[in-house]
């Protein structure tokens, strides 16, 4: 059906704007943020702080996930407060380490917390197609922020890191909108007898994008940085705009999907749990 092919295109566009970007994200941060060298013999330059950050990441992920399943309000919000405190602590440690790797590692933490919320919302309230549109809008906003806003903070250590953290967290949230809303939509678009083949076809199409766009990012990066030999001085504006264009294409297809859903009564905006 046309709905299935639209969902497949949305999948490849959204994932191609995120997964290939992850391969270049650390270097992009190195090019757009100002870091100072941390003494190797200090606490922030030691290997111990890396292990502590790993533990904090697991703590944040666990508490954010558990928050969704707590019944008592007091306990629920206490767990949420612990998760937020852990996230802030992790971000502070990433800043003190002056490490682009530590900063980008925050990417999945918000997604861990909100994906169950989004999945539960789709089950009980629906609006899967609208979530895909929202995810595309967030995707566009994040890549344009990386392209045009973040470079303006170069030289401002605190401001640049704050913008980077917020944008990375929102990008993670946009990423979580895709699996929470897209994958549950597939059974509504194909016959149950071929659901396995449908998922396989989507993954096949998706992998074409995951193969192609890392190459394109590298080609565009080389073409727009001729003569630049310092890897921390590259200009990422053009590749980021290209990724934002994927978000624009996904947004357009998302609106088309909503129109097709309304005309053909595909049920994408309806809850999965029908009373």
Model segments located where?
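Multi-pass alpha-helical transporter architecture, strongest
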Residues: 147-150, 236-275
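A late C-terminal transmembrane helix in Major Facilitator Superfamily
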Residues: 192-226
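Transmembrane alpha-helical cores of Major Facilitator Superfamily
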Residues: 12, 105-109, 137, 200-208
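Helix-to-loop junctions at the C-terminal end of transmembrane segments
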Residues: 63-71, 114-127, 221
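Extracytoplasmic gate region of multi-pass secondary transporters
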Residues: 1-60, 86-111, 115, 179, ...
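C-terminal transmembrane helical hairpin of 12-TM major facilitator-type secondary transporters
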Residues: 78-94, 99, 105-110, 128-182
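A membrane-interface helix-boundary motif in multi-pass transporters
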Residues: 219-247
């Amino acid at each position: 059906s046309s709905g299935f092919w639209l969902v497949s295109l949305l999948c490849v566009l959204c994932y191609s704007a995120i997964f290939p970007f992850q391969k270049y994200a650390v270097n992009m941060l190195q090019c757009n943020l100002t870091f100072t060298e941390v003494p190797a013999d200090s606490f922030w330059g030691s290997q111990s702080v890396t292990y502590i950050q790993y533990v904090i990441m697991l703590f944040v992920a666990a508490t954010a996930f558990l928050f969704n399943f707590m019944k008592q309000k007091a306990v629920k919000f206490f767990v949420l407060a612990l998760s937020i405190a852990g996230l802030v602590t992790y971000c502070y440690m990433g800043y003190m380490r002056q490490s682009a790797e530590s900063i980008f590692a925050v990417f999945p933490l918000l997604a861990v917390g909100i994906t169950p919320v989004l999945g539960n919302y789709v089950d009980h309230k629906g609006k899967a197609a609208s979530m895909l549109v929202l995810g595309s809008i967030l995707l566009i906003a994040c890549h344009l922020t990386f392209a045009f806003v973040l470079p303006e903070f170069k030289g401002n250590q605190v401001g640049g890191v704050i913008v980077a953290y917020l944008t990375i967290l929102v990008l993670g949230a946009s990423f979580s909108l895709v699996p929470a809303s897209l994958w549950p939509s597939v059974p509504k678009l194909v016959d149950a007898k071929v659901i396995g083949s449908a998922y396989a076809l989507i993954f096949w199409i998706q992998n074409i994008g995951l193969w192609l766009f890392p190459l394109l990012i590298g080609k565009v990066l080389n073409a727009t940085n001729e003569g630049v030999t310092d890897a921390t001085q590259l200009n990422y504006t053009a590749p980021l705009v290209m990724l934002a264009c994927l978000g624009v294409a996904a947004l357009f297809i998302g609106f088309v999907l909503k129109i097709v859903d309304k005309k053909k009564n595909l049920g994408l905006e309806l809850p999965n749990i029908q009373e």
